[in-house]
Amino acid sequence: MFGLRLAQASAALALAASAGSALAVGLGPLEKSGITSSERKGLYLTVSNPYRTAHNFRVFVEEDSGIAPGRVTIHPSTATIASGAHRRILVIVDGLFPGEEVNFRLCAERIEERRVTVHARVCSKLGARRLRPAR
């Protein structure tokens, strides 16, 4: 009887531990685009911390996502966010030519201080388009 309860308690603890590590940073909206008449376009996104304690997060352009990372500026690209809190970030796309449209993926993840089993991240699909001059 005691052994059965101990096994149930161990299983519950293992499930709770695995569920806690499977949480992922929040990033929204998951898709956003905008139009500009200048060579720069800014977009606001929100990073959320679903964990029970404050953590450090980073936001970055996904490799091979269709834009050179040097054309994108992220303010801030790293931040400490309190438990259950949100932080707005500004993403600026630079060097847009008239008529050019760029699409890329921007990702957010928790900065891990140790090796973890599940490395969770979330990505948004972003787009920016520059208008052609009127004739």
Predicted feature locations:
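Cleavable N-terminal signal peptides
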Residues: 9-12, 22-23
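Bacterial N-terminal signal peptides that target proteins for export
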Residues: 1-10
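Short, solvent-exposed loop/turn segments enriched in Ser/Thr/Gly
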Residues: 37-44, 87, 99-105
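Short acidic, flexible loop segments centered on an aromatic residue
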Residues: 50-68, 108-110
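Intrinsically disordered, low-complexity Pro/Gly/Ser/Thr-rich segments with frequent PxxP/GP/PP motifs
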Residues: 69-99
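Beta-sheet-dominated interaction scaffolds and their linkers
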Residues: 23-47, 78
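Terminal connector regions
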Residues: 95-135
